[in-house]
Swiss-Prot record:
Its main location: membrane. It comes from Treponema denticola (strain ATCC 35405 / DSM 14222 / CIP 103919 / JCM 8153 / KCTC 15104). InterPro entries: AAA+_ATPase (IPR003593), ABC_transporter-like_ATP-bd (IPR003439), ABC_transporter-like_CS (IPR017871), ABC_transpr_CbiO/EcfA_su (IPR015856), ECF_ABC_transporter_ATP-bd (IPR050095), P-loop_NTPase (IPR027417). Residues 2-241, 269-487 form the ABC transporter domain. Pfam families: ABC_tran. The lineage of its organism: Bacteria, Pseudomonadati, Spirochaetota, Spirochaetia, Spirochaetales. It is a peripheral membrane protein. The keyword Glycoprotein does not apply. ATP 1 binds at G36, A37, S38, G39, C40, G41, K42, T43. Belongs to the ABC transporter superfamily. GO terms for cellular component: ATP-binding cassette (ABC) transporter complex. This is Putative ABC transporter ATP-binding protein TDE_0282. Keywords: ATP-binding, Cell inner membrane, Cell membrane, Membrane, Nucleotide-binding, Repeat, Translocase, Transport.
Length: 489
């Protein structure tokens, strides 16, 4: 099905090989997990399999890639795309329409299917994937996880022989990841070949047949799933991989008194009875909580629950319909919130503007000494990339750059929307250390996240949002109940 022989590749403008002498064979019907640190070559390997290398991404290419009987260099990209369907790390980059129905059948429409067949296929796909609630929606109004579901649906509709999934769970909530795992099982039973590049590997332990671990553009380990599951935990950590079982991750115990200002001694950021409306519909209803500098508050919940809307409201980007937000008892207007806060967005590509990592750190920040930038970049393993263009970075590297800028900006209120999306274990821990350092400096720190591993090990408290309301609060060892609580909403 897929045969790679002595493949080496480097992107134009880079000195090192992004892939180095890769040889492997993946038979029909096998489910393969690609794992390894951010920047190890996983995404580049997926681009080789789907034909984007060498047809779209230019660079120095050598070796031979046979995909479903076709030589990838000689075959037309349209022929390859009939055989290989890809869900990209950032689903926004593969959308061509403004509404969900058109997007799901876009590939089939390009193949010339008549309207009645398009409608029939649309209904079957949405029923199979249980996404009827996403029919006839604007792409621009979807949450990150909902966009990921639509991207998957558009690939599923085309029924390719090979599925390539690049970080498919990165923006998904706990329920959606469970649904994704069932869907992967379903297409596996159909005899499809599946290649999944992932950092969150826990949901794939009973699905994958094989694990390929990459390091510095090379295949360092190639093993069957049983061998991988039997590896000692110490070896998994030395490989810088995330947990294989969420139950093995135990919560950090942080005692929070009813008066959080006594516990942490910092400034108090209070949200009272916040309601946000989209047209005549309430997206958030009567949201109230308070946090003190020194605390790290996590806000989690299902895709579309209103988490990103809440983040945008807290930092003044979205207008509340009712309620108030204050800092040390003083009301904060939208303008004041924008001046005093910094938000790391879910799609960090929206807030990267310059032509180098170093310049990005300086943007809009006066009199910032070079040693301060170097210290933060080193702490986030970005110092060697400081001359690179931000848009040439991997998804995880872009995420860390946005976190670096948040540290350097000097704002009082810091809001992170999915800061660990696309991050490996080492990068997640580095981001966690940086966020803890901000909390230690008595900054107000609020993290919007689906990452249960991150919540348990880094955050002081977690608020569960459902249907636009806060339905549960957990802190300390109670965070170990998080998966169980998420199952109930």
């Amino acid at each position: 099905m897929i045969t790679l022989r002595n493949i080496s590749f480097s992107y134009n403008g880079t000195k090192e090989n992004n892939l180095c002498d890769i040889s492997l064979h993946i038979p029909k019907g096998q489910c393969v997990l690609l794992c390894g640190a951010s920047g190890c070559g996983k995404t580049t390997l997926t681009r080789l399999i789907n034909g984007l290398i060498p047809h779209f991404f230019e660079g120095e290419f050598s070796g031979e890639a046979i995909i479903n009987g076709m030589n990838s260099e000689e075959a037309d990209i349209a022929q390859l795309s009939d055989s290989v369907g890809t869900v990209f790390q950032n689903p926004r980059t593969q959308f061509f329409n403004t509404d969900t129905d058109s997007e799901i059948v876009f590939g089939l429409e390009n193949r010339g299917l008549p309207p009645e067949q398009l409608l029939s296929r649309l209904e079957k796909v949405t029923e199979d994937l249980q996404i009827q609630n996403l029919r006839e929606r604007s792409i621009f109004e979807l949450s990150g996880g909902e966009k990921q579901k639509i991207a998957f649906a558009s690939v599923y509709a085309a029924a390719p022989d090979i599925f390539v999934l690049d970080e498919p769970s990165s923006n998904m909530d706990y329920h959606s990841i469970k649904e994704l795992s069932e869907l992967i099982k379903k297409i596996k039973l159909q005899g499809k070949t599946i290649i999944i590049a992932e950092h969150r590997i826990w949901y794939l332990m009973d699905i994958a047949d094989r694990v390929i671990f990459m390091e510095n553009g090379k295949i360092a380990h190639d093993m069957d799933i049983k061998t991988f599951v039997d590896l000692p935990e110490a070896q998994i950590k030395s490989m810088k991989l995330r947990c294989r079982n969420l139950a093995d991750v135990k919560a950090e115990t942080v005692n929070v008194s009813p008066d959080v200002s006594v516990s942490f001694g910092g400034h108090t950021f209070a949200v009272k009875d916040i309601t946000v409306k989209l047209g005549h519909t309430s997206v958030l209803q009567d949201i109230s909580f308070s946090t003190t500098g020194g605390e790290i508050i996590a806000i989690t919940g299902e895709n579309g629950a209103g988490k990103t809307t809440l983040a945008r409201t807290l930092c003044g980007l979205t207008q509340e319909a009712a309620g108030s937000i204050s800092f040390d008892g003083n009301p904060l207007s939208r303008k004041m919130r924008r001046e005093r806060s910094y938000m790391v967005m879910q799609d960090v590509g929206h807030q990267l503007f310059t032509d180098s990592v170093y310049a990005e750190c300086r943007l809009g920040i006066k009199d910032l000494p070079d040693p301060a930038i170097d210290e933060v970049l080193t702490e986030l393993s970005l110092n060697r990339l400081k001359e690179r263009h931000p848009l040439s970075l991997s998804g995880g590297q872009k995420q860390r750059l946005a976190v670096a800028v948040s540290v350097l900006c000097g704002k009082d209120i810091l809001i992170f929307d999915e800061p660990t999306s696309g991050l490996d274990l080492k990068s997640m821990q580095e981001a966690g250390r940086i966020i803890k350092r901000l909390a230690d400096d008595k900054k107000t720190v609020i993290v919007i996240t689906h990452d249960i591993e991150f919540i348990k090990t880094i955050c002081s408290r977690v608020l569960i949002l459902s249907g636009g309301k806060i339905v549960k609060e957990l802190c300390g060892e109670k965070k170990n109940e998080l998966e169980m609580q998420l199952e109930t909403f």
